[in-house]
Amino acid sequence: MATMHGLYYQATSTMDATHVNHVERPGTLPIAFSLFHYTNMEDASFMLITGETPVWNDGWQQRVQVSVNDHGKHRTVEEMMAQRIGDYDEFCTYQRTVFDRTEAWLAQIDPEELERVVIPRPFPDQVASTYSARVAGPGGITVLDAAECWMYQHGLRHMGEIELARSFVGLGGMTS
């Protein structure tokens, strides 16, 4: 997870608010969407897995000033086209806070905890159509499934979007 988070740190340290808020054309989400969406979803996923309160709250919204105070999972592309990050430095602080918490949790997790079922079968409609439902075993989505799908795989997917979108603003990718 730390290596994947490192890609996000590399990306954010080589961009500014102009880059992340750029809209290439209608239907193409700004980098701001992918950055905030993924970070906020990792924050929310942590809550679903551990029961701990998310980092994101009204205070963080006042600091970061995203234009759409929502991760956007259940919104349309048209709605999320409006996503912008108002204070990019504060966003980077929020991201670091979320990622540090996840990494600290993973560093101390009891391996037996990885088998605990987070969402049992049968899955609700919102879950049944997800990648994690495909990965889940007969009992449902375990902590390991959730961390792999909701955090790691999801993070890499959005990093791919970010690397492509960086080319739209004259920046390159970070890996080969």
Each language-model region and where it sits:
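Short alpha-helical DNA-recognition segment
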Residues: 17
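Proline-centered turn/helix-capping motifs that create local helix->coil transitions or kinks
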Residues: 106-116
